[in-house]
């Protein structure tokens, strides 16, 4: 078992917490991390890009001039893709880019990222996020003792004051423990867990 120091919201050490090595001392597997990020981004795509083929472009079907004798190139339709106002050949059409990644591979990718963060002292565990108000200024004042540039806070959705007070801060993201993913874990340089959140995450990843 690994031991990590538990701090309060003011960055004072209050206790220690044991973390399982099979989750927080997992080897770095870059190929799994790559696949997990690719899967996450593909699932986020709207897939609404659409172009008009020659069959969808508006315009008459009349032949513009006779086939032979004019000296000009032959043309059958004003909607021909060769023309500026014509249709698009092989353009993008609406499609679903999402696909499923094996659950075990996805979990192992998350273990790999979390273990790497912990090895580099980029994971903090806080006993609890007790806030007096949902004002952004007050929350940032309490977090000022932690040295970070981009922070991912993992707690429970029930903590509405924390969610509301950080949602407008561009360099902080607060999520429920069930929403943690490889992409956000990589995007934010530091991760801050509440004790309850990290315990529940361990139960999920076991």
Task: Please name every model-derived segment.
Residues 30-68:
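A short, flexible low-complexity segment enriched in Lys/Arg and Gly/Pro that occurs
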Residues 1-46, 91-206:
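Extended polybasic, low-complexity segments that bind anionic RNA or targeting/receptor surfaces
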Residues 54-90:
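Glycine/serine-rich anion-binding loops at beta->alpha junctions
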């Amino acid at each position: 078992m690994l031991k990590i120091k538990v701090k309060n919201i003011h960055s004072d050490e209050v206790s220690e917490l044991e973390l399982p090595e099979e989750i927080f001392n997992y080897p770095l597997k870059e190929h799994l991390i790559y696949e997990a990020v690719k899967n996450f981004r593909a699932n986020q795509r709207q897939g609404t890009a659409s172009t008009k083929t020659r069959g969808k472009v508006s315009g008459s079907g009349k032949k513009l001039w006779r086939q032979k004798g004019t000296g000009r190139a032959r043309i059958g339709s004003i909607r021909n893709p060769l023309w500026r106002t014509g249709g698009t050949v092989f353009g993008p059409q609406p499609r679903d880019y999402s696909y499923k990644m094996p659950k075990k591979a996805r979990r192992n990718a998350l273990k790999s990222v979390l273990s790497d963060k912990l090895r580099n002292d980029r994971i903090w565990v806080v006993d609890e996020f007790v806030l007096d108000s949902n004002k952004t200024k007050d929350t940032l004042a309490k977090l000022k003792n932690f040295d970070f540039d981009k922070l991912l806070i993992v707690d429970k959705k029930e903590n509405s004051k924390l969610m509301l007070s950080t949602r407008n801060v561009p360099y902080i993201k607060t999520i429920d423990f069930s929403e943690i993913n490889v992409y956000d874990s990589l995007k934010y340089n530091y991760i801050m867990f509440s004790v309850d959140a990290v315990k529940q995450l361990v139960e999920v990843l076991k």
